[in-house]
Amino acid sequence: MTDDIRLRVVNPNTTRAMTDLIGRSARVVAGPGVRVDAVQPTTGPASVESHYEEALAAVGVLEQVRLGEADGVDAYVVACFGDPGLDAARELARGPVLGIAEAAFHAATMVARRFTVVTSLGRTVGRAHELLDRYGFADACAGVHACEIPVLALEDPASGALERVTAACRAAVEADDVDAVVLGCAGMAAFTGQISAAVGVPVVDGVSAATTFAAALVRAGLRTSSRGEYAAPPAKPVTGMLAGFAIGSAPSPAAVPTA
């Protein structure tokens, strides 16, 4: 392949600083020949920490995928550990769409027999277990632990987030007797190397894993199957505030890319 791979990393929340952080993390591992476009929805929650916010964020993910399809994007990463809107995005996209939770679980089992997950808030633990079951990794995961740090506090130096997440990872490794840690929030992406050095086991960041896998799938000529469940949605009227999402309608041009 001679042309650059165009990879769109979608931060499902609307906080620009987190979009920038996610974009930097993706670019570190993307390598030559991959153009990373980190974007966020034009509307939606400032962070995703509940089922309600995840449902709202999914609409923003689909907005950015539709815009990406009109712009010739080759692959997508949904950069929130709940993988919001992942199945729906796969119905819309020509190329592969990866969620960071699914990618992180795969990566962890490639470097360790069993792993543990350290996430942000206790209320998100159930969603992590749900995804482990769905993706087939429940037996490989020894536990899911919350460090009780709100998502937006992860980038606040005054919160002591790095130290608190590191302590939670160390405690989880010892309690679960595992050989790897999966970080359960895209906002933790910048901590990976420091935590791994401190704890002494591989620490998997889903943004890095999904970025690497998405580019590899494009290079291998693999894309989401258009047969069966991931076939394009049928065209039908969509009314009200979501009318612009009707299949066949022109997507809004108001993408919000980072610099």
Tell me what each language-model feature is:
Residues 5-29:
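N-terminal beta1-alpha1 ligand-phosphate binding loop
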Residues 9, 70-80, 177-185:
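Periplasmic-binding protein-like
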Residues 17, 109-147, 160-163, 216-259:
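Short, glycine-/small-residue-rich phosphate/pyrophosphate-handling segment
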Residues 38-63, 152-157:
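N-terminal beta-loop-helix "entrance" segment that forms/cooperates
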Residues 55-72, 163-177:
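Short, well-structured alpha-helical segments in soluble
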Residues 58-113, 117:
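Glycine/small-residue-rich loop that forms an oxyanion/phosphate-binding "nest" at active or ligand-binding sites
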Residues 95-102, 137-144, 201-208:
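Short hydrophobic/aromatic-enriched beta-strand-loop microsegments
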Residues 129-185, 191:
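Active-site rim beta-loop-alpha module in soluble metabolic enzymes
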